[in-house]
Amino acid sequence: MKTYCILLLFMAASIVRAQEAAPKVALLNIGGIDKPGGTITGIVRFKGAKPEAKTLTDIAGNAYCKQCYKGELPKHDDFVFGKNGNDDTLVNVLVYVSKGLEGKKFDPPKEPALLDQAGCMYTPHVVAVMVGQTLKFRNSDSTLHNVMATTWSNPPFNLGMSSGQVIERVFHQPELKINTRCFMHPWMSAYIHVLDNPFFAVTQADGTFTLKGLPPGEYEISVLQETSLFEPAPATAKVKIQANESKKIDFVFAPKAK
């Protein structure tokens, strides 16, 4: 019994040290580059009857994950409305330049992006990176997770992650909607978008986005949201922008026609 207790204390101390050693990596929302150029801002809204997100009741069946939530369990995050669900804006929508940059080359950011596992959820639910940029996966929980990424243009991977562990991956091909899950906790889901230019953003808690540093030119701006319940009208917008010019573009999603 004495040996067993010592082993438990050693394991607990190891978990604490691992969590303390985990590097603090900024959650990135690139939104363009810090150079002179045009700026596009906007907001993504939802029009129509708002569906209600379902509670992740499966969490209650896992002792560790349940104790992460003292009150109400979290809800599915395949769609999230702004201001904690109290308004008509949409969070976690990818906004990006889809045409107009052909032939141009951009260096990936040196600073890594982060996809964290915390409270038995992926945070953020949507992360966007450039081709060649480092994406760090971190397990901030005191339980075992794994990262299982389903890809088409990049090599897939399925890696176990102990508490406090950080792994790095670099995607070498553009690819949208890479679904990332945890095999041990099936409700855990995130999406990774990989783009070949830095002019993209994921809408914030108020549904807003900013694309900055755009060279003068004509562009097509597209939006992407993961659920099949919604569709944008339209899905793209064309804009012509001059040096140091600012323009505003809003997008609207609505329930998908049956």
Give the residues covered by each predicted segment.
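Positively charged n-region of N-terminal signal peptides that target proteins for export
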Residues: 1-4
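Acidic/proline-rich low-complexity IDRs
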Residues: 6-8, 55
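Hydrophobic h-region of N-terminal signal peptides that target proteins for export
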Residues: 8-18
